[in-house]
């Protein structure tokens, strides 16, 4: 009797919603950024890294929207550039960039390494396109 209950509970726990929005670095406009991303229904998860005058927005697109990934990425890029004209904004829907951005957040990098890592991720994204 307890085994089926344990199985059901573990399945429900596995289906629990993970954190969908993560901001790392400067939190001065965290709620604005979160609102911008939540307005787009095609975004499944996102990680935003803000450092000085640059912002890296890594998103995961919902499965049925992946066919339009580049178009949606450009749309989000324009939206962020319009909202933050004085920041160097970079938006990517590439999973590798999303993974690395989450790794940066998890590792809690120091400022000197953070700047280098963001530059490295931008170069990686340009290579893949």
Can you name each region flagged by the protein language model?
Residues 30-38, 66-88:
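Short, non-transmembrane amphipathic alpha-helical segments
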Residues 35-70:
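Post-signal-peptide N-terminal segment of Sec-exported extracytoplasmic proteins
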Residues 22-28:
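Short, surface-exposed ligand-recognition loops at beta-strand->loop->(often short) alpha-helix junctions
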Residues 16-18:
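Bacterial signal peptide processing site
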Residues 11-14:
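C-terminal motif of bacterial Sec signal peptides marking the signal peptidase cleavage site
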